Amino acid sequence: MSEKPKNRYFVPKNGRNRTQPVSARAAWLLVLSCFCVLLLLCWSAGYGLSARPGPREISKSASTEPNAAREQVSAQPNAVKTACELIYQGKFDAAAELIEQPDRTVYPQLGRLAEIIQQYKGISEQRQSAREAAYREQLVELQKRQAQGKTTDVNDTNDVNDVNDIVNVLSVITKASEFASQEQREHLFSDAFVKETIQKAIDKAADFELRGKWLDAYINCYSWLKAIDPNNKAYSDYGEQLLDKAIIVVSLQDSPCESREERYKGIEKGMFVWAIEVLSGHYVRRTIDYSHMAKQAVRQCKLLAEVMPTAFAPKPQGQSSESSPSSPDANQLTAWSAGLAAISDQIEQSSTGLKKDELIDVFEKVLALNKATLELSQSALVAQFTEAALSALDPYTVMVWPRQVQEFEKSMTNEFTGIGIEISKPKGLLTVASLLQDTPAYKAGLDAGDVIVAVDGVQTKDMTLLCAVRKIIGPAATKVTLTIKRPGQEKTRDIVITRGKITVPTLRGWNRTETGKWLYMIDEPNRIGYVRVTGFSSETASELEEVLKNLEGQGLQALILDLRFNTGGLLTSAIEVSDKFLKEGTIVTTRSPYAGVLTYAPAHEKDTHPNYPMVILINYSSASASEIVAGALADKTHNRAVLVGDRTHGKGSVQGITHYPRGAAQLKYTMAHYHLPSDQRVKTREETEKQGKKDWGIGPDVEIELTSDELKKMLDIQRGNDVLVQAGRDPNSASLKRHSAQETVAADPQLAVGMLIIKTKLIEAQLAALAAGQTRPVSAKAL
C-alpha cells in the first residue's frame, strides 16, 4: 500500500451499516450485535438522449410527417408536462385527474401516462394487499402463542417465561406492528397479552443483567422492545447501556483473533491529550462542551466498576489487573467508585463548564485513581476513557488505534491483501457467498457455496465474521490454508491460497453473464441502464466512465443509479461522479466555522455525459458521499435526477484524518458540514432528532418505503444475481439461481417505481423532441 499523506479530507462510510474499524467501540458493537442484526433483518424495516442513438422511431407518422407532428405538439396544452411533473413528485392521483380531460386520441402521450399511472396503482394495491395479509397472519400467530401459554397440557413443552418463547412472541408483535395501520397499532398495544409479554421481556432482561449477561439482555429483550416502539426513549437508553456494558466485557477479554494485549498494544495516554489539542483548533463546532465529554468518560469508568465483579473471576492474591482481567476486591471497587464520585462532583460544580485543560486534568486524575485502586491496564483505560469522551461530540469523531489502522485504511481505499472472496455465516457455517473475478481464490478453485471449516487449522464454528476476515487476509505473497466442504461432497479438503492485492470494484449491474461479467442494461427495448454503486473509492469515477461509455455505445436512453446501502466513501469520488452529469454550477460546498468554505466543487462542461433521464434510488443506508451525489443531482438548481426510495441516513458532515506524531494511531474528526448547490445544508440525523424533527439527510421525490418482507425478497434476488461462481458451473444448479430482469424489478418496489419514473421521463423527452422538430425522437415503443 502506498504511503498516505498526513492529512486527508473525505466523507467516510457510516460505521452503523458496514464493517469498519473506526473505533474499538464500533468494532466490538459489530461483533456483539451481528446475531441481533441477523435476527431482526427479517422483521424490521424498512435501489436525454444517447451519445450515439440508434435509428429508432416513435411512429411512422412522426418520422415521415414532421411538420404535422410539430403542429400537433404546438397545439397541445401543457397537460403532459404538468402530469409528468406531478408524477416526479409522487402525486400519481393528481396526475390521473389531470389527464382525464384531454382527448387521448389527439394526445397519445397522455394515454401512455395513463398506463404508467395504472401500473403504479397496481403496484400500490398489491403492496397494500400484502401488508393487510401479513398483519392478519401475525394476529393469527399471536392468538396461537397466547393459546399455548394458557394450555394445561402437562406434555406441552411451551414455557411462556422461557426466553426463546418470549423472543418468539416479541418477533410476532414486532412484525404485526410493522404492518398495522395507526388504529390497528393502538389496538395491538392495548392487548393484555401484548402488554404481558412486553413486561416479561423487561423482567427477563433484569434477570439477565443480574447474572452479568448484558448482551443476552439486549439481544433477547431490548433489541425487540426498541423495534416494537422505536420512539420509546427509555428502551433506547437502557438498551444502549446494556450494549456499553457488554462491549466493556468483551473488550477486556481475549478473543480467537486477538489477545487483549494485542488489542491495546501501542496505545499511550499522550494520544488522548493530542486528540483534544487537535479538536480544540479544528472541530466543526467552535464551542466544544468539554464538561459533557468528561461526564461521558467518567460514566464509562463507572460502568467498568459495575461490570467487573460479575464478568470476571476474583483477582488472585498479589496479582495485578495489568497482566489479565479479573475482578478487583470490594475495597478496591469502593475506593474506585468513591474517587469517581468526587471527580463527578467537581465536574458538576463548574458553573461555567470545563475548559480544555480541565478535561485533561480529569483524565489524569482517573489514571491516577486507577493506579491506586483497580490497577487496570493503563492502555485499556486510556482507550475506554477516550472513546467515551469522543462519543459526546458526534458518532464520526473517533480514534483509530494502532491495531485498527490497517483495517481502517482498507475500508477507505477498497484495497487490501487477501484472497478475494465475500463470506457470510448462514446457519452458523462460514460460507463463501461469492468470488471476486481474477483473484487468488478464483484461480485456486474456491467456489461460491463452499463451507470454510477451518482457517490454518483453526475451526470456524465459533468464529465471528470479523475474526474470520482477519485470519484470511494477510501480507501479500503469504499463504493461507482453507479447509473446505463443498455442497454434495462428504469429505473436506484443503486449499492453499497465496494472498495478493485485492481491489474491490464499487460498481455492479442488475445481473451477471455466464462468464461473470455484469449486465447493466436492465430494459433492452427502452435502453434503460442500471448501475449500482456500492461505495465511493478512488476508482469509482473511472469505473463509472467505462460503464457509461459502454451503455451509450448501446444506445442508452435513460439511467437508474442505485445508491441504496451505499454508506459513503471519498468526497473527491462523490464530486467526480456528480460532475459526469452536470455541465455547470456548484456540486457541493463544505464549510467550517474556523476556515469558512473548505471545499467548493464546480461542475465542468468537458466530458459531461448526455442529458438522458435519470433516477437515483436511495434509502436509509445511503449516507455521506451518497447523499452528496443524490443531493447535488436532484437539487432544484440542477434538477438532473429524480430521487426514489426513502430518506437517507443523514450524516451531513465531512471528516478529516490526522496522524499521531509519535505512533500509529489516527484521529478521525468532524471538521465541516456540506451544503447542496442551492446552499441548503444537509442536516444530521442526531441534531434533527434532538429538535423533534425528521427532515434529516436527503428526502426522496417519490417516497417508497419497503417493508421487511419486501426488503428480504429484494435482497435475496439481488444476492442471487450478484453471485460469481467458477466458470463451468451449471447455471441451472439449485445453489445458483439467476433471475430475469422482469423478476428482479417485480421483487423490488423501489426499482419498479423508479422504472415508471424513467419511462415518464422518456415520454416527456419524446414530446420535447417532437416540439423541436426532431425526426428521430426518443423511442417509446415499449412504454
Q: What residue ranges belong to the model's regions?
A:
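Cationic-aromatic interfacial patches
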Residues: 188-202, 207-346
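Short, charge-rich amphipathic alpha-helical segments embedded
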Residues: 99-123, 174-196, 225-243
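C-terminal "post-core" interaction segments
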Residues: 4, 8-13, 18, 28, ...
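PDZ domains, with a preference for the canonical peptide-binding region formed by the helix
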Residues: 446-484, 545-549, 573, 651-657
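PDZ/PDZ-like peptide-tail recognition elements
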Residues: 379, 384-386, 393-434
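Hydrophobic/aromatic side-chain positions at a characteristic register within alpha-helices
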Residues: 84-87, 146, 161, 209
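PDZ/PDZ-like domain segments forming the peptide/carboxylate-binding groove
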Residues: 144, 149, 203-207, 261, ...
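PDZ-domain C-terminal substructure recognizer with occasional recognition of PDZ-binding tails
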Residues: 428-431, 453, 467-512, 670-671
